[in-house]
A protein has these predicted regions:
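Conserved catalytic-core segment of NTP-binding enzymes
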Residues: 1-80, 86
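P-loop NTP-binding site
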Residues: 73, 92, 108-141
Length: 141
């Protein structure tokens, strides 16, 4: 409790990071309630480690459910990306990897924090690429 109190003293804005898991969303809901009780109502959420395939199968919560549950604005979605592990082990920031969706997601979040209007990335197999397009064609038939 005291750590939370110390972290919000003097804050005028808060960013809550949540994983697409029920326990994480419950914890985030408690934190948002405490922020509101402290009068800190300017807050947003980042959904971290979103696995598109698991979400599509219904194995994890999806972004609209998370946002509806928490009743906050969405600042960004960071996909669960193996590139993060690789870049971390190399000691290199993921934002330097132009091919990593997670790196682009972090850049977009930073731009949104600076007031820019940046659309959310399309995540998962429905994004781009020849094989994705072929897969979608076969799924329709």
């Amino acid at each position: 409790e005291q750590g939370f109190e110390n972290s919000v003293v003097g804050a005028d804005k808060a960013v809550v990071v949540v994983n697409p898991e029920i326990t994480s969303v419950r914890d985030a809901d408690r934190v948002i309630g405490k922020l509101d009780a402290k009068g800190l109502e300017d807050h947003a959420v980042i959904v971290n480690r979103l696995n598109y395939e698991m979400t599509k199968r219904g194995d994890t919560l999806d972004v609209p459910d998370i946002i509806e549950t928490l009743s906050v604005k969405l600042l960004g979605v960071v996909p669960d990306d193996r590139s993060i592990t690789v870049s971390t082990n190399k000691g290199e920031p993921i934002v330097l990897d132009d091919k990593a969706q997670s790196g682009q997601a972090f850049k977009n979040i930073a731009r949104r924090l600076n007031g820019e209007e940046v659309p959310l990335l399309k995540l998962g197999s429905e994004s781009t690429g020849l094989f994705s397009a072929i897969r979608r064609l076969f799924k329709k038939n």
